[in-house]
Amino acid sequence: MDNSNTAIYIRVKGQRPKGFVDPLPFEWNLEKEKRLWSIISTLDSNRQQINWKLLSETIEVPEYFLKERSYTLFSNNLQKLGKFIDNNNTSNDPSKVIPGTSQTGDYSNLKALDVSKGSMDGKDMCQDMKEINDPNYVDYDVDNEDETAELTLQKLQTSKILTQQNPMKIRSKERKEEFQETSDADLWSSLSVSTSALEEALMDRMHI
């Protein structure tokens, strides 16, 4: 018992209200408080009701005091629970953790990773060693596109890709030659027919 949870009644002079009864003296100790808390803290749902009259008779404490004391116990425990939650959230918040320490407060040796610009160059990291060792490998440089295009053209010419004849041109040439041969044959055929006809006509005219 202390000043924060002890009710003090002061008797003053004057007429008592009608039906007023002096509260009976009672004893309140830690054992009774634990017993009260064990009962009110184990309620399963709002449907369960406390029989304050029976509880008052069992603990031998006035009913009004049990209700007030129950409210005080719940209030104190809720405050403790709120502080516990606040402390737990603070310890688990990464923004509130001291740099160089873990969330549990243990210090760890953190080494800074020094990454230079050259070590993270994607060109150096992505090049294949087989391509670099290839004599026909051409390194593409964005800053010198003309030189790169010229080198690429030279590589294509040396690899005989551009020197090969176009298959479409070859087919067109073959078709043209076939058409020319066919035209010549038809012409000679028609000439031979005309010559034969002229010979027959001359023979008839000459009555041979």
UniProtKB/Swiss-Prot annotation:
What InterPro entries does the record tag this protein with? ATG29 (IPR039113), Atg29_N (IPR040666), ATG29_sf (IPR039362)
Query: What are the entry keywords?
Result: Autophagy, Protein transport, Transport
Compartment annotation: Preautophagosomal structure
The entry lists its GO molecular-function terms as: SNARE binding
- Source species, domain of life: Eukaryota
- What Pfam families is this protein classified in? ATG29_N (PF18388)
Q: Name one GO cellular component term.
A: Atg1/ULK1 kinase complex
Q: Which family does it belong to?
A: Belongs to the ATG29 family.
Primary role: Plays a role in autophagy. Functions at the preautophagosomal structure (PAS) in order to form normal autophagosomes under starvation conditions. Also plays a role in mitophagy and regulation of filamentous growth.
**The protein, known as:** Autophagy-related protein 29
Q: Which gene encodes it?
A: ATG29
